Swiss-Prot record:
Record flagged with keyword Hydrolase: yes
Superkingdom, taxonomy of origin: Viruses
Active site (UniProt): E44
Residues that hold Zn(2+) according to the record: H41, H45
Cofactor notes: Binds 1 zinc ion.
Organism name: Molluscum contagiosum virus subtype 1
EC top class named in words: hydrolase
UniProt name for this protein: Probable metalloendopeptidase G1-type
Length: 593
């Protein structure tokens, strides 16, 4: 590690898949709670900008931090990738604090589309932030348009809070030119922020929360010490369902359970709690996990590998200390219990966006009962499973990967998906067969619409036939379908579903994946969507496209008028309580020969 004079920490990471990775501690959306929810996420969207023909980049905003990364598509553009990332924060050698010329309205519309996308496909439920005084979703909504002047002022104030000790930078190759670039940019930040916000996060004590969730969970507050953090790192290498969360200066250890009785058993037997360490701690963590450690715990001033000896030599004492801390916290009711619930009518609380949930006080006296050893899911050697697109279980595997992204890595291939994981076969089967997980994976059916209409355009089945089997993912491979698409004079079909989206088939002699990528970024800049998915069809220069959007009419008009599209057949879905597919007529759209 190289420590710049102002406290910025720079780590060379030769094996990293990114060229540069920047983490900003104490810069997440929990800072919005006393001010205006959504400012942090809006700032992230405004800052990141890049040439997608030369680079791949992304950014994220979490509760306590922000992170940004960039990677060049060609090796000769490595230094340019670093310069691009630096330009997000510095312009002409000075920190960016003036946002008077930024078209904030379009960015806010993009945030609303992202909320809609995440709410349709996932359940956006940030329980700790809600209990601390925020909302269940804190990424920004259209209501920010009502306070544009205040938003611009807050964006500048937020940037002026950047300070050297809160910045962590990973670089794949730390050349003299790269180091000089970082020194004359991030190295010029002050050691202390110009303003220190009065973050007002309420205390959380003895709560049970019922929300849509794939697992039962316990969030137990422990002392935020280096010993407890190292103990959690030890546990994470042994157990799948152990992790941590931070809220301000507080540290929570999280435990997830497949079955309710295992969650109850953990609380009943916490006095006899004994964790089993891994034979050897290897620190085989992703770049994202390591970055999250540094930005969540700014007092980590050494390379993580420097703690490797301590993690192995003192793992057992570290775990014993954490166990005692957990017992004390349970006795003092410093915990949150999460129970999965999928009933929209069962609630007694709501946030400012009208998200509803049930919040109760925990009554541990009711937990008295016979001892039971909680079911543990220990990590196994890395394994892979391949699931074809026609397999009815595909949706379950996808839902599993989305629910546990750190434990399972999903990769889309031409004929199916490959899931890399560290579970035993019995453990994975038990999780996917559990009643709670099944309810969770079926509770957000909007993700299926992409495949429902892909099947409609690429197979011989009618919409009625496809809808009868919507719970089983489409059993076909679009690349193998040789049906000839015949575009009718009527190029648009209006339907009513539970979601708002645009999808269909586009054809044009110059249409390509690169062109669709350019279209996605143009639509994002206009604030019309968050993401555009596309699938190459069998016919030449023909693509199936799909996009969730709260502005489906504008997205459709863009594709209908796009010069690269010579023919199109689109479905525009408006949101409604009763689904109506009556406008779709297979024989009009597709002729199978």
């Amino acid at each position: 590690m190289i420590l710049l004079e102002n406290g910025v920490r720079v780590f060379p990471k030769p094996g990293m898949g990114k060229d540069i990775y920047i983490g900003l501690a104490n810069f997440g959306f929990e800072n919005d709670v006393p001010e205006l929810l959504g400012v942090a996420h809006l700032l992230e969207h405004i800052l990141i900008s890049f040439d997608y023909t030369r680079f791949v980049a992304n950014a994220s905003t979490a509760r306590t931090y922000m992170s940004f990364w960039c990677r060049a598509l060609r090796a000769e553009d490595y230094l340019a990738a670093l310069e691009t990332a630096v330009s997000w924060f510095f312009a002409r050698g000075a920190l960016r604090t003036d946002f008077s010329r930024v078209r904030i309205r379009n960015y806010v519309r993009e945030l609303e589309n992202e909320y809609y996308f995440r709410n349709e496909v996932f359940h956006c439920m940030d329980i700790l932030t809600f209990l601390g005084g925020g909302d269940l979703y804190n990424g920004g909504r259209l209501s920010m348009l009502e306070q544009l002047d205040a938003v611009r002022e807050l964006l500048g104030k937020r940037m002026r809070r950047l300070a050297g000790p809160n910045v962590v930078i990973f670089v794949r190759e730390l050349s003299p030119a790269a180091l000089a670039l970082l020194e004359r940019s991030f190295g010029t930040l002050p050691r202390f922020p110009s303003t220190i916000p009065a973050t007002r996060l309420g205390s959380i004590h003895n709560k049970a929360v019922l929300v849509p969730a794939p697992f039962y969970a316990l969030l137990i507050q422990v002392d935020n010490t280096v010993e407890n953090v190292l103990a959690v790192i030890c546990l994470a290498e042994s157990y799948h369902f152990v992790d941590y969360e931070t809220l301000g200066e507080r540290l929570y250890v999280s435990f997830a359970f497949v079955h309710e009785q295992d969650c109850e058993a953990f609380l009943r037997n916490v006095g006899e709690l004994r964790f089993e360490p891994a034979p050897r701690v290897e620190l085989n963590y992703s770049d994202d996990y390591v970055m999250n450690l540094y930005v969540n715990f700014p007092w980590l001033q050494h390379d993580l590998a420097d703690y490797l000896y301590t993690l192995n030599a003192d793992c057992v004492p570290l775990l014993r200390g954490l166990e005692e801390n957990l017992r004390r916290s349970v006795r003092e009711r410093q915990l949150v219990v999460v129970y999965p619930s999928f009933s929209p009518s069962l609630f007694n609380s709501r946030d400012r966006q009208d998200h509803r949930l049930l919040v109760l006080d925990v009554d541990l006296a009711r937990s008295a009962g016979p001892a039971r050893v909680p079911r543990t899911f220990r990590r196994q050697p890395r394994a892979e499973v391949f699931v074809r697109y026609g397999d009815p279980a595909l949706l379950d595997y996808v839902a599993f990967a989305l629910a546990r992204p750190r434990a399972a890595a999903l990769r889309r291939l031409p004929r199916g998906v490959r899931l890399a994981h560290g579970f035993s076969h019995a453990d994975m089967h038990e999780i996917m067969a559990s009643e709670t997980f099944i309810k969770y994976s079926r509770s957000r059916p909007a993700a299926l619409f992409q495949y429902i209409f892909l099947a409609f355009f690429a197979t011989g089945r009618s919409i009625a036939e496809i809808l009868e089997r919507r719970e089983a993912l489409v059993s076909f491979d679009a690349r193998r379908c040789v049906n000839r698409l015949v575009f009718a004079k009527r190029a648009r079909y209006d339907v009513v579903t539970k979601s708002s989206f645009v999808c269909g088939v586009l054809r044009g002699p110059r249409l390509s994946e690169a062109a669709l990528t350019r279209a996605m970024w143009e639509l994002k800049r206009k604030g019309l969507l968050y993401s555009l998915e596309h699938t190459r069809m069998h016919a030449k220069h023909t693509f199936y496209v799909f996009a969730f959007s709260i502005y489906p009419e504008q997205v459709y008009r863009y594709f209908a008028r796009w010069q690269l599209v010579s023919k199109h057949c689109c479905v525009v879905s408006m949101r409604g309580e009763r689904e109506d597919y009556s406008a779709l007529r297979k024989e009009v759209v597709v002729n199978f020969v």
